[in-house]
Regions:
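Canonical WD40 repeat/beta-propeller blade segments in eukaryotic WD-repeat proteins
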Residues: 16-23, 78-88, 128-135, 170-178, ...
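Short loop/turn segments that connect beta-strands within beta-propeller blades
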Residues: 54-56, 118-120, 156-159, 199-202, ...
Length: 324
């Protein structure tokens, strides 16, 4: 496939409002799993769809779709889900089961249970705080950011939680990510500091205050030694060295707010989306360029890194899949 070749533009959810779309696994060597969360306009119901698509064929009949979750709430949740986490749940023999876990089944509102699906046997936790879920890189482990408190770790195998907190401190955490070597959890907080939690020894490291508050953080290199930080205050991207994260360099200053950024290890580039934009922008150490223009406002994007696929949700609630 040529770069940026359109794989499929016919996955359309026009009667619905889409929130997120993300890739799961590659199955049968030619099919890709896709998770779509959104809300039905007519019925006011939230849903999570699971579908597979044959990326070697452009025939629409090669798409298989099922409803993984269709949950009705008596009251509208205070916030909608922002991220989908496709994880396969392993049993004690480490054999993959057919159960799929996704944050599309999680809701932010207080006093609501976290659900895997409609089966009550899969209720995991009762959460009394607004929770913000992001993708994790470990089987059976979920990292959830609990606003105004800290980071909670949900262990699905043990069905228990623990909090990562710094003694004597309360934190409002803007964003975090887990390093590619699975060693560190990096936090960006409203106090303009960056915190690094070493999972192997439980030690914590705290930076000096930055000039600007950092609102988003993500991986910055394949070796896990660098990471990006972004500030809404001055619309600037910063690149940090995790070995001495008080040192950083300005990467680029934007004219408008960045709403989402993602470091793609396969492409070794940072991809980001500006507010109200119709294009996905990529950046490396040499140049910044627009890699996809939809001519429609883009709501969300994600990657399947093994095959270098990117999915894009546009304002008309359709999903576009391109090959990078």
């Amino acid at each position: 496939m040529e770069n940026n070749e359109l794989v499929n533009t016919n996955i359309n959810y026009s009667p619905c409002i889409l929130n997120t779309c993300s890739f799961g696994n590659i199955i049968n060597n030619n099919e890709i799993e896709i998770f779509v969360s959104g809300k039905n306009k007519a019925k006011s119901k939230s849903f999570l769809h699971y579908l597979t698509y044959d990326f070697n064929s452009k025939d629409e009949t090669q798409k298989k779709e099922t409803t993984l979750l269709f949950q009705t709430w008596n009251e509208t949740p205070s916030k909608t889900v922002n991220y989908i986490i496709p994880i396969r749940i392993n049993n004690s023999q480490n054999e993959s089961q057919n159960s799929l876990l996704s944050s599309g089944a999680f809701i932010f509102s207080s006093q609501l249970e976290l659900l895997l699906n409609n089966n009550d046997d899969y209720n995991l936790y009762q959460i009394d705080d607004d929770i913000y879920i992001k993708p994790n890189i470990e089987n059976d482990i979920i990292y959830g950011l609990v606003l105004d408190i800290g980071l909670k770790i949900f262990d699905l195998a043990k069905k228990e939680t623990k909090s990562i907190l710094y003694p004597g401190r309360k934190h409002i955490i803007n964003d975090y990510f887990i390093s590619s070597d699975n060693k560190n959890i990096i936090f960006a907080c409203e106090d303009r500091k960056i915190y690094v939690y070493d999972k192997t020894d439980g030690k914590s490291f705290i930076s000096k205050p930055n000039k600007m508050e950092i609102n988003q953080v993500c991986e910055g290199s394949n070796d896990g030694k660098k990471f990006y930080g972004y500030s809404d205050e001055d619309y600037t991207l910063y690149l940090y060295d995790i070995r001495n994260f008080n040192q950083f360099v300005d990467v680029v200053k934007q004219d408008v707010e960045i709403t989402k950024m993602f470091y793609n290890k396969a492409c070794q580039q940072l991809f980001f989306l500006e507010f109200g934009s119709e294009a996905i922008i990529s950046i490396d150490s040499i140049k910044q360029e627009s890699i996809y223009e939809s001519h429609k406002m883009i709501k969300d994007f994600g990657f399947q890194e093994q095959q270098k696929f990117m999915n894009i949700i546009t304002e008309d609630n359709s999903i576009n899949i391109i090959s990078l």
